[in-house]
Amino acid sequence: MAKRFTLSEAQRLIPEVDRMLREALDAKSEYQDAERVIQEFTEHVMMMGGVLVDRDRALAARSLRDEAASRLRERIEAVLETGCLVKDLDIGLVDFPTLFRGVEVYLCWKLGESGIGFWHGVDEGFRGRKAIDQDFLDHHQGDRPQ
């Protein structure tokens, strides 16, 4: 069973999740840059019929790509280990499972927002976000202490 958060529990995780998402986005950008260099080498070789390329530079690009992919994977896994769900890395969209009136819903946060101010049903997604109001505050709950 997935962890369910209270609003305050999820809010406390925001600084850590923010940092990890930014690190993941940096790694993704580095991966894409290295992949472009590799693609350029590949296209150059194909166009020139196997002409020699700067082997050291090509190997360095592959190494950078692989290191960035590893960092990206590690950062995403670290975010997921907190119990929240990465819905869209590119915009930094994260959901935190919770219960509202006994039904599982998600607290919704996006990179750049100062805190969690929205929630939505599990099938509604970002477009179905609703502002957290007093009714939600009065009737949502995380996991019960064991």
Tell where the protein language model's regions lie, with residue ranges:
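Amphipathic alpha-helical coiled-coil segments
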Residues: V17-A34, A61, R65-A68, L72-R75, ...
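Heptad-repeat coiled-coil alpha-helices
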Residues: D33, V37-E40, H44-M47, D54, ...
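Alpha-helix boundary/capping detector
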Residues: R36-V37, E43, R57, V105-Y106, ...
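A short, surface-exposed helix-loop junction/capping segment
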Residues: G49-A61
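Short, flexible coil/linker segments at or flanking structured domains
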Residues: F5-S8, R12, R19, V53, ...
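Long, hydrophobic N-terminal alpha-helical segment
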Residues: M1-H44
